[in-house]
Amino acid sequence: MKTIFYLAFFYSAFSFAQVYEFLSTKNNKTISHRIILDKEYLIETQFIKEPAEFILTRGGYYKKKGKTYNIELEFNSNFENDGFTIIDLRKGKSWLKSQNKPIDLNGKWLMAGRVTELGERRRDITGPRKTMKFLIDGYFQWVAFNTETFQFFGSGGGFYTAEKGIYTENIEFFSRNNNSVGRILPFKYKVQDSDWYHKGKSSKGKPMHEIWTKRSNLISNK
């Protein structure tokens, strides 16, 4: 199913890494809309900041024609309700572009494995079940999904810093547990070749040592 959304935003020169935000109101609640994109991929997320409430997220590879982004969705957390697999986002007048500067970790990263007492345990990143983390100019979002079944397993995001070997996430929305919003999660990190290692504790307080790899290393079907 395809639908067209005439979303308004303040237009500025297109660049390959952007974050936009705007607000809307529904049932007396203020909804934050965030869109993060690079030269080929776009994620739209809607959430309420106070009190914290996750609404939806959806994203995929896009093509741009004029003022319209045509997105072939890889995931849609609201799929069971709306059935959308393709959407068009058209420029209007109310998005505000983030002025944050690019950070070295910018990009799409796939969960590639974990480091255990026995060494690295890698997972197959070519299958349909993926966990992806999208980092753009100090904003992050992770999404777990299945590209074949369109199953959505969860998502969370917010903003981050990466300085002197410490990567820190500030959670602004979390589909699985609104109580996680506001938490600050620091990790030790390093980038080695095209892998990003980070070590710390999850939002549940459990130790973790993860390996992420750039999605550009995987030939995708678009």
Regions found by a protein language model. Give the residues of each.
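Bacterial Sec-dependent N-terminal signal peptides
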Residues: 1-21
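Lipid interaction determinants
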Residues: 15-155, 168-222
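Beta-propeller blade signature
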Residues: 157-162
